[in-house]
Amino acid sequence: MKLLNKLAAVAIVATALFTACTEPAPISYTLTGILPDSSFNGQEVILRENYTRAIIATDTVEGNKFVFEGVADTARYCYAQVKNTRTFADLILENGNITLDFNAERVLPTGTGLNDILRDIYAVCDTIEKENMEAVSAEWFAKHGNDIIGIVLYGSPLFFTLDADAQIARLEGMGEINKEKEFIKKEISRLKARKATEVGQPFTDFEGKDAVGNTVKLSDYVGKGNYVLVDMWASWCGPCKREIPNLAEVHNLYKDKGLTVLGIFVWDDIKNLQPAIEEEKITWAQIIDTEKVSTTLYGVSGIPSIMLIGPDGTILERDAAVRGENMKPTIEKYLLKK
């Protein structure tokens, strides 16, 4: 009951504040970031809008702090980051004096009404029971589907802990202002593609090139009687490289026992493929996809993305079940079953 009362109180305040903050008058702001020590002095800080990554302003750290001042036409969900570091924090850029204290254990913005709500969202997400997440998420998105708080919710556990059906429902239920944002449109499309290629669905075919430039299809490998372990990867991707020993192990063990390992080279320049193959000692076939066709069709938001497809073309497993230490046992579950 206390949690629901907290949510109700925050929702009332959010509604009142957003009404005040959507007046057409320009927004003037001062954003001050306080950094822990002088080692940051001289470094560049970038203020960007979340999701679009559009740069709003830059500053240089002096005296262990940075300051952004300006005028914006509406409240925006942003983040400030010391360039090329993991020192960053989210905030809502709005009228008033906003402070980010990087000495805090958890850096959250203070000083303005909408940023107080952002802090409350984090607090609620930290304390809410998992079984209440769906109901609370539905309530908040219903109230804030067309304002800046709705965009904050989209980046919170009140969205990303939901299943794909609920996520699609939240985004499609947004008001036109938010739903017309390009990154929301893309996320709806991605989620629907992910849903269409989830475990139990038939594989979706696509074309790419092999290492010598010939056109090849996923169906050249899938549906031929073998289990196919598909790995979408790139040469610059650290987590992708960490999966290569696991892929090599199952490839060497089971390449003659009903398993085909297939790499899909994505989000990378074709010139990087051969050096990566040589460096990592990759011996399995590759499809080169420079047009992002495969990752779009399969709703992939990050790599590596690995899936196991059965002999009949049915998707059997995706991601966690065939990543890391789970890969070999999962493969063996299918290959060695009686």
Regions inferred by a protein language model and the residue ranges of each:
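Amphipathic alpha-helical repeat scaffolds of TPR domains
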Residues: 145-156
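Alpha-helical repeat scaffolds
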Residues: 165-175, 204-205
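Thiol-based oxidoreductase modules, predominantly thioredoxin-like and allied folds used
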Residues: 258-272, 282-292
